[in-house]
Amino acid sequence: MSGFYHKHFLKLLDFTPAELNSLLQLAAKLKADKKSGKEEAKLTGKNIALIFEKDSTRTRCSFEVAAYDQGARVTYLGPSGSQIGHKESIKDTARVLGRMYDGIQYRGYGQEIVETLAEYAGVPVWNGLTNEFHPTQLLADLLTMQEHLPGKTFNEMTLVYAGDARNNMGNSMLEAAALTGLDLRLVAPQACWPEAALVTECRALAQQNGGNITLTEDVAKGVEGADFIYTDVWVSMGEAKEKWAERIALLRDYQVNSKMMQLTGNPEVKFLHCLPAFHDDQTTLGKKMAEEFGLHGGMEVTDEVFESAASIVFDQAENRMHTIKAVMVATLSK
C-alpha cells in the first residue's frame, strides 16, 4: 500500500488524516473480502513475532487470525516466553528479531519500549498496547463508528468517553479526534483528565480538521447529543485494594447506565467498550467488586446497558482483527 510500506505503527499522531482514512478504507475492504470469500493473501511467506509482556485475548487473537488469513506465520512470545528486558536488552532483542521476522508486534509497558524496538529492529513494529497509547483499538473503534453511522463523516459525529480518561485509551482518543475532526468529549473528574500538553496539542489539530475536544466533569452537559458513549474499566487485577476503593469513589458518578444514555437525548445513541468489561459478577474481579463495594449489576457500565440493543461492543471486538489486518497488509506488502 503506497506510503505505508515498511512503516511502524506506534501511535496515531505519526500519521496524517489522509493516511488514517486510507487505513480505515483498507480495513473495510479486507473485512468485506473475508466475508464474501474473496480475500487475497498478501503476506504469504511472511513471519511475524508477537511480543506480549501483558496477556491479552482480543489483541493476540486479532493478530494471529489476521496473519493466518493473509498467509503469514506467527510466533507468540508471552510474558514468560522471552528474555526481553530481563536477560537481554530491548535494543538487542530488536536486532535479533529483526533478522528473523518481517514484522514485530509489542504489547506491554512503556511507550519507550516499543519506540526502541522500532528504532533498532529494521522491520515494521506495531503497538498492540502500551501504558501510554492503544492505537490499534482506536482503529477498530473508528471503523465501528463509520459502520453504525454510514451517512455521516467523523466531523458530524460526537463521541463521549466517560470515566478514567488519563489512561492509554484517553490518550489515543485525543489523537484520533485530532486527526478525524470528531467532536470528542472526555467526561471525567478532573483528577482523571489526560496530561495538559497532549490535550493542547490534540485540540489544536482537531480544530484544524473541523473537530472539537472538550473536557468536563459535568455528566449531563458532556453527554448531551452524543452519538456514542464509551467507557473502560476502572481498576485492574494487579492494583492494590486501596486503589480500588479510591478509584471507585472517584468514578462512581461516571458509570454508564440507562440514565446516562437517556441524558444524551438521542434514542439511537450507541455504547462502546474496548473490553473486557466488568458489567456483572461473572468474573473473579467483578464478583469481588460486587461483594466489597456493592457494585451489583456492573462497575463502569451496568449489565442493562451492556446487554442492550445500544451496545455494539462485539462489533468493535471483531473489528480489532480487520483493522489490525489492514495495518499488517499496509506495512508489509507493496
Swiss-Prot record:
Protein function: Reversibly catalyzes the transfer of the carbamoyl group from carbamoyl phosphate (CP) to the N(epsilon) atom of ornithine (ORN) to produce L-citrulline.
Catalytic activity: carbamoyl phosphate + L-ornithine = L-citrulline + phosphate + H(+)
Example GO molecular function: amino acid binding
Compartment(s) where it occurs, according to its Swiss-Prot or TrEMBL record: Cytoplasm
Official protein name in the record: Ornithine carbamoyltransferase
Family to which this protein belongs: Belongs to the aspartate/ornithine carbamoyltransferase superfamily. OTCase family.
Pfam families, per database record: OTCace (PF00185), OTCace_N (PF02729)
GO BP terms, alphabetized: arginine biosynthetic process via ornithine; citrulline biosynthetic process; L-arginine biosynthetic process
E.C. no: 2.1.3.3
Binding site residues for carbamoyl phosphate: 56-59, 83, 107, 134-137, 274-275, 320
This protein's record includes keyword Iron: no
Annotated positions binding L-ornithine: 168, 232, 236-237
HAMAP family referenced in this protein's UniProt entry, alphabetically: OTCase (MF_01109)
Biological or metabolic pathway of the protein: Amino-acid biosynthesis; L-arginine biosynthesis; L-arginine from L-ornithine and carbamoyl phosphate: step 1/3
Keyword entries, A-Z: Amino-acid biosynthesis, Arginine biosynthesis, Cytoplasm, Transferase
Gene name of the record: argI
Top enzyme class: transferase
GO cellular component: cytoplasm
